Regions:
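Short hydrophobic beta-strand segments that form the core of ligand-binding sensory/regulatory domains
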Residues: 74-77, 97-101, 145-152
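Glycine- and acidic-residue-biased ligand/ion/polar-headgroup-sensing regions
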Residues: 92-113
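Alpha-helical bundle regulatory/interaction domains
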Residues: 109-208
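A sequence-composition feature that detects small, non-aromatic residues
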Residues: 22, 27, 45, 59, ...
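Beta-strand elements of well-folded, non-transmembrane domains
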Residues: 80-82, 102-106, 153
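N-terminal low-complexity or simple alpha-helical regulatory segments
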Residues: 2-94
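Short acidic/polar alpha-helix capping motifs at helix-coil junctions
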Residues: 22-28, 49-51, 97-101, 120-122, ...
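Mixed-charge, polar/low-complexity N-terminal
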Residues: 46-48, 53-54, 59-61, 103, ...
């Protein structure tokens, strides 16, 4: 590159990075509501966004999240009034690569690959390699309660390198359905997150 090409490239990359909004703003734009700062159901160290009857025709409840350095923990806590069919991931790859959900309560299905979404099950997404025919379906008149942990790839691979584990074999194992041992491990973590009522900075220490 000559100096002019380099300056132009830096400008393009800077504009691209500026286009990726903060996760808080991403959630706010997607849900089309302001943060429910008075809702104390989950830890105040995170952020809670609520859907009431007038905000959505198909679901009512709340979404809570805590964002750390390289990871996001979130809780979906909704009553599904009408069948929900989700066929895209709304650019989640901008924020996390691997996203595992421990499902406390649900009645639905995930397609391509197929998996039933039922209580006490684990559902993992690789947002960097999600397929175009991805479909996520929740049936009407059901409660959807799930605790999820999403990691950026850089954080995962840094940790894998430190313990000498091959990333490809790790991802291959992680994305297999019906992992009883991993599901049981995440069940304990999920219940602790659901029951955490700590404020910052104690909650920051707990979530990290």
């Amino acid at each position: 590159y000559n100096s002019f090409e380099l300056i132009r490239l830096i400008g393009i990359l800077s504009k691209r990075d500026m286009c990726i909004m903060a996760y808080y703003d991403f959630v706010k734009e997607y849900m089309k509501v302001d943060e429910c700062k008075n809702n104390k159901k989950y830890s105040s160290a995170g952020h809670t966004f609520c859907w009431n009857k007038e905000d959505s025709t198909y679901a009512e409840g709340l979404y809570w999240f805590y964002e750390g350095d390289g990871f996001i923990i979130d809780i979906h806590d909704f009553y599904v009034k009408e069948e929900i069919v989700q066929n895209n991931t709304h650019s989640m790859a901008d924020y996390v690569s691997i996203y595992s959900s421990y499902i406390v309560s649900a009645n639905g299905e995930k397609f391509n690959p197929y998996q039933t979404l039922t209580p006490n099950s684990l559902c993992t997404f690789d947002f960097d390699n999600i397929k175009d025919d991805f479909v996520f379906l929740l049936h009407e008149n059901c409660c959807y309660l799930a605790v999820s942990i999403g990691f950026k790839k850089e954080l995962i691979e840094k940790h894998l390198a430190s313990i000498n584990i091959n990333p490809e074999s790790f991802y291959s194992s992680l994305l297999q359905p019906n992992q009883i041992i991993l599901t049981k491990s995440l069940e304990k973590v999920a219940l602790e997150i659901l029951n955490c009522k700590m404020d910052a900075p104690a909650a920051d220490f707990f979530f990290k």
